[in-house]
C-alpha cells in the first residue's frame, strides 16, 4: 500500500507550507489513472495527521477522469485504464492527456487574529 507513504508526503508538504498554523482543510486532485486509490488516502489521512498541524483537518478529494487522445486520428476518448482503443479508428496509439494527476489543489488554514 504505497498510499501510506504518499499520504505522509502530502501531510509533510502541507505542514511545511502552513508554517505552524493549524490546517482546517486539504483538497487533493487524484486522477483515476494515477494508480493511487483515493479511498486508501482517505483511510490513511486521519492517522497520519495525528500530532501535526493537520490534526482534525478535513480531506476533500476531487477525482479526475481519465482521457486520452488518439495519435493517429486525434479523437479524444474517455479512459478507465491506462490503455485502450480509439473509438473512431480502432488505433491503440493513445496519449494520456488527463487522469494521472496527484495535486494538492488547496489548503485552508485557521485565521490568526492578532
UniProtKB/Swiss-Prot annotation:
What molecular function does GO assign, one term? Answer: zinc ion binding
Residues recorded as binding Zn(2+), renumbered to this chain, are 70, 73, 86, 89
Q: Which residues cross the membrane?
A: none
Domain of life of the native organism: Bacteria
Asked if Metal-binding is a keyword of the record, the answer is: yes
Residues at which Ni(2+) binds: 2
**InterPro entries noted in UniProt:** Hydgase_Ni_incorp_HypA/HybF_CS, HypA/HybF
Q: Which GO terms describe its biological process?
A: protein maturation; protein modification process
Which UniProt key words apply to this protein?
Metal-binding, Nickel, Zinc
Which family does the similarity line name? Belongs to the HypA/HybF family.
Question: What does the record give as the function of this protein?
Answer: Involved in the maturation of [NiFe] hydrogenases. Required for nickel insertion into the metal center of the hydrogenase.
Query: Which PANTHER family does the protein's record reference?
Result: HYDROGENASE MATURATION FACTOR HYPA
Name it: Hydrogenase maturation factor HypA
The opening ranks of the lineage are: Bacteria, Bacillati, Cyanobacteriota, Cyanophyceae, Oscillatoriophycideae
Q: Which gene encodes it?
A: hypA
Amino acid at each position: 500500500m504505497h498510499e501510506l507513504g504518499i499520504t505522509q508526503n502530502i501531510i509533510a508538504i502541507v505542514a511545511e507550507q502552513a508554517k505552524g498554523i493549524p490546517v482546517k482543510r486539504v483538497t487533493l486532485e487524484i486522477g483515476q489513472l494515477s494508480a493511487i486509490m483515493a479511498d486508501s488516502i482517505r483511510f490513511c489521512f486521519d492517522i497520519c495527521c495525528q500530532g501535526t498541524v493537520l490534526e482534525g483537518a478535513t480531506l476533500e478529494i476531487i477525482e479526475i477522469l481519465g482521457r486520452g487522445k488518439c495519435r493517429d486520428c486525434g479523437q479524444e476518448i474517455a479512459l478507465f485504464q491506462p490503455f485502450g482503443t480509439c473509438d473512431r479508428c480502432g488505433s491503440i496509439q493513445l496519449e494520456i492527456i488527463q487522469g494521472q494527476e496527484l495535486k494538492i489543489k488547496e489548503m485552508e488554514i485557521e485565521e490568526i487574529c492578532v
